[in-house]
């Protein structure tokens, strides 16, 4: 019941109790990793109707008709996650060497939030009775007004396939576009799942780097900041290692459609009347794990002959 309804005297305690019970039920479902009941009911109503929703372009939709793929509905998964307390490295003095450490609290927060969002996306797809979700997109956010919280939002289009699902009977998620997905199927491969990984590293610069990045020495000739370079490599390799481990767990033979996104934040630290600039490096890696499915299908190209001005004949 809304605030104006209360002012007008509409509704009652029974309605308030029902709303409170519904909220508590949804909170319990979310805490268990599921989706709110209203979202589940919306999906079931969409499936029961005759119309579908999708993020497909006109060309992509036309391709579904040619490939006997039926779009079902758009599905979504999200997770807003509070990051736990994270201890930052602290150098012992101006003359200390460089140090590099993974911020495990932040790394784990990103990976867990994304896993929860993908799980909810897959649950919506299951309620829709779909076999796969294509064109899965990720939106990773950190809000200025919630500095210790992150949000992961994933969207995709649930589709029904002529061959059904795989051995797991669960919808397969892929960030491939529909045309890429169709081409992959024709080549004798199938996606076995989305692979996603994040790593966050903290880099304390060495004495040499501090000299080159503070005070008058900023005007020195071009030089590589090798400890910062090493930190970026370490963060990338850590994220790639996790992604590769996920692919192996899915029984994949490779990863396609991979995207690598990275952010670098500067953190100023004052110590012993000196100021240094530390780096926080974040890598997000996303891709689709694939495996062979059998013999490839020929692409069967069409031949078009131009017989005159503006005339086209299809054999």
Identify the role of each PLM range:
Residues 75, 80, 89-137, 215-262:
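Short, well-ordered alpha-helical segments
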Residues 50-56, 112-113, 133-138, 171-176, ...:
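A short linear-motif detector with a strong N-terminal bias
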Residues 2-17, 123-139:
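Short N-terminal signal/transit or membrane-insertion segments
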Residues 132-144, 254-277, 281, 289-290, ...:
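Short, conserved loop-to-beta-strand elements that form functional interface hotspots
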Residues 2-106, 148-149, 154-228, 272-315:
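Intrinsic disorder/low-complexity detector
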Residues 109, 113, 144-150:
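Short, well-structured alpha-helical patches and their helix-loop capping segments
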């Amino acid at each position: 019941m809304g605030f104006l309804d209360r002012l007008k005297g509409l509704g009652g305690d029974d309605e308030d109790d029902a709303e409170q019970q519904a909220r508590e039920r949804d909170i319990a479902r979310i805490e268990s990793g599921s989706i709110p009941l209203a979202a589940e009911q919306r999906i079931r109503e969409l499936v029961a109707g005759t119309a579908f929703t999708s993020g497909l372009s006109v060309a992509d939709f036309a391709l579904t008709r040619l490939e006997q793929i039926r779009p079902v509905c758009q599905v979504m998964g999200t997770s807003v996650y509070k990051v736990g307390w994270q201890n930052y490295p602290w150098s012992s003095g101006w003359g200390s060497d460089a140090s590099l450490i993974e911020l495990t609290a932040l790394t784990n927060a990103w990976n867990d939030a994304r896993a929860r969002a993908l799980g909810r996306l897959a649950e919506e797809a299951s309620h829709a009775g779909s076999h796969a979700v294509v064109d899965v997109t990720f939106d990773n956010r950190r809000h200025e007004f919630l500095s210790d919280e992150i949000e992961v939002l994933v969207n995709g289009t649930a589709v029904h396939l002529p061959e059904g699902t795989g051995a797991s009977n669960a919808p397969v998620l892929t960030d491939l576009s529909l045309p890429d997905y169709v081409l992959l199927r024709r080549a004798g491969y199938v996606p076995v799942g989305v692979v996603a990984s994040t790593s966050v590293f903290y880099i304390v610069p060495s004495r040499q780097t501090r000299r080159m990045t503070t005070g008058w020495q900023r005007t020195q000739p071009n030089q590589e900041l090798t400890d910062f370079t090493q930190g970026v490599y370490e963060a990338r390799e850590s994220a790639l290692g996790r992604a590769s481990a996920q692919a192996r767990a899915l029984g994949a033979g490779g990863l396609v459609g991979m995207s690598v996104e990275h952010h670098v934040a500067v953190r100023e630290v004052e110590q012993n009347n000196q100021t240094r600039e530390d780096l926080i490096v974040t890598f997000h890696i996303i891709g689709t794990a694939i495996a062979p499915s059998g013999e490839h299908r020929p692409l069967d190209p069409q031949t078009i002959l131009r017989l005159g001005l503006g005339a086209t004949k299809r054999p």
